[in-house]
Amino acid sequence: MAAPGDPQDELLPLAGPGSQWLRDRGEGEDEAVTPKGATPAPQAGEPSPGLGARAREAASREAGSGPARQSPVAMETASTGVAGVSSAMDHTFSTTSKDGEGSCYTSLISDICYPPQEDSTYFTGILQRENGHVTISESPEELGTPGSSLPDVPGIESRGLFSSDSGIEMTPAESTEVNKILADPLDQMKAEAYKYIDITRPEEVKHQEQNHPELEDKDLDFKNKDTDISIKPEGVREPDEPAPVEGKIIKDHLLEESTFAPYIDDLSEEQRRAPQITTPVKITLTEIEPSVETTTQEKTPEKQDICLKPSPDTVPTVTVSEPEDDSPGSITPPSSGTEPSAAESQGKGSISEDELITAIKEAKGLSYETAESPRPVGQLADRPEVKARSGPPTIPSPLDHEASSAESGDSEIELVSEDPMAAEDALPSGYVSFGHVGGPPPSPASPSIQYSILREEREAELDSELIIESCDASSASEESPKREQDSPPMKPGALDAIREETGVRAEERAPSRRGLAEPASFLDYPSTEPQPGPELPPGDGALEPETPTLPRKPEEDASSHQSPAATKGPGPLGPGAPPPLLFLNKQKAIDLLYWRDIKQTGIVFGSFLLLLFSLTQFSVVSVVAYLALAALSATISFRIYKSVLQAVQKTDEGHPFKAYLELEITLSQEQIQKYTDCLQFYVNSTLKELRRLFLVQDLVDSLKFAVLMWLLTYVGALFNGLTLLLMAVVSMFTLPVVYVKHQAQIDQYLGLVRTHINAVVAKIQAKIPGAKRHAE
């Protein structure tokens, strides 16, 4: 296809892969490049047989144009290993120009030659068979021709031939790698993404094509006669469906820092006559800073819509559109600040964009922190200018993604870039640019994967917590494992404070422990002191002290096995519950009444009997005085005995009753409130019941109470109150034990007594009219 400029310009033919397009300078001014083994290009008016009708048609147009018309400039595309086809043997672009009005096509040629760098070349312009024809570069004989080998031709080490917003970059290729790719059909199929680039005409120049129908006919005839050299690729569009190319203007001063190709008008006559050698290309993905594009647009706003128009200040660019994606993980955010061109809106580049989009989608699967392999030091030093303009690291091609996807590792692991320059080069927009790249080739997308910093920090925290917990477990061995796992490790300062607090409490309870350790009579020194807890070790790191329990006397332990149905001693008390009084405890009273501790029960039972018999013989005042004298005589005698014993043995054991002296016998407010409430309940209940009986709320109940009082008159005449109290105490200490031993017989007799009593009550109720009606 061709892109006509203005009436003074010639159509620009598109060169397919494996073919070379050449336009010789007219009137014998310049000579074309004559490769080894190829036929020299003829002068104007003498087309060579190798070029056929194409060269003859060009010569005739050139001869008839005259000085008023400018000779056309053709852009030429070639691949490695092509020999003897046209005037340019085995490299990409070669153009010639005729002196005219000063407007011509810009060439993609650099006259600066550098030593060949075989190790830094890639080639991705793959050729393949189409429509049953074989292109020239696929000929095995020509690929094996010694004259066409790439090492004999010096490479061009331009670090960016030109750049555009489409971002396709050219890289020198190596002949050995090209032969390998061409020989392998599988690699040839995988590299279809780099086959063709569609350069078509924009809509704004269609009217110019209508003004020159004969030029269009000549150009179409010119292409039809050249089908034996260049076969039209499938990816190239027809003229009726153009994908316009957006022309971007880049000034000369923006391109001074890199070795860009000079323009045609700037070339001298010697340079035009000299053979121009170029290198094959590789299409890679790079990025351009938006600032450069903005500067370019501000400086040349009126030339944004010029598409391949002959001018010394223009550089043709090729735009390969990519689908915009607003997702956060997208590497191709929507373009801003510039209107999308026709090629961008259509998104139908002749480069296999299915493969390119597949590569972009695969890159989307990764995070923004896609790792880039470290660049060589030499390459970083050689490309300071390119870093200022180039974008983020090279996006891997579809071929490279097959290898990089296998190395991506676990999807949960973030990819962190090891190259510090990757963060500086990270830009939001992706482009494709043409240009010769020197130095070592860009490394394929095989990022070195490492764990993210956050994950490493988390693992370090877990390790430190495990170490702290192990240390705490060793220092506090009595703590339960569940508490060690659930509760966070405590600091040493908190543990020290707990140890000091427990130590102070242990010192306060020490006298009470020693007092309970010594044997003494509970009858002589009854106490209502709360039960003290055992002392905690000063160095114990346990947070929960053991619950204090009352020590069991030997008598109680000896009598505990006598009754299997009897309940054992009092259990451990809760930390918040106030300890009850010694002789007012319900469990303690049950143990005394059931004679579970014979010695203790005997002492208590004997003391009660002595007191009651004394009261029967003497007055209460006399009994209290005598009991006090007896207690004092016992304590004083024991105190003197201990003092004499310590003097004789020359020991200093201290006061014999020191433990009891330090024992606190005060009642707490909670204990007083507890027993006061209980007493209040019984007092109130008794008063209510007496009121109900005496006020005859219920006649039957009142009569029963009257009968009870009549019987008590007989009991009072026979027994004294102290005798009754004595009989009650004896019954309390004897009846429970007798009932346990003879429970079956007692229950039988109690049943008979209950039946007899019920019969008597029934007879009495039958004789009382009011009681009978009440029973009904």
UniProtKB/Swiss-Prot annotation:
Bilayer topology: Multi-pass membrane protein
Q: Which residues carry this modification: Phosphoserine?
A: 327, 350, 352, 487
Extent of Low complexity compositional bias: 328-341
Segments traversing the membrane? 603-623, 705-725
Q: Where is this region: Disordered?
A: 1-103, 136-168, 204-244, 285-580
Residue limits of the Reticulon domain? 589-776
In which domain of life is the source organism classified?
Eukaryota
For this chain, the Swiss-Prot or TrEMBL PTM comment says:
Phosphorylated.
Matching Pfam families, A to Z?
Reticulon (PF02453)
This protein's GO cellular component annotations are:
endoplasmic reticulum membrane; Golgi membrane; neuron projection; postsynaptic density
Stretches with biased composition (Basic and acidic residues): 204-240, 497-511
Q: Where is this chain's protein located in or outside the cell? A: Endoplasmic reticulum membrane; Golgi apparatus membrane
- Xref: Gene3D superfamilies: 1.20.5.2480
- Report whether Transcription shows up as a keyword of the record: no
What's the main place this protein lives? endoplasmic reticulum
Record keywords, A-Z? Endoplasmic reticulum, Golgi apparatus, Membrane, Phosphoprotein, Transmembrane, Transmembrane helix
A biological process term (GO) from this entry: negative regulation of amyloid-beta formation
Subunit (UniProt):
Interacts with NDRG1. Interacts with BACE1. Interacts with TMEM33.
**Biological role:** Inhibits amyloid precursor protein processing, probably by blocking BACE1 activity.
Under what name is this protein listed? Reticulon-1
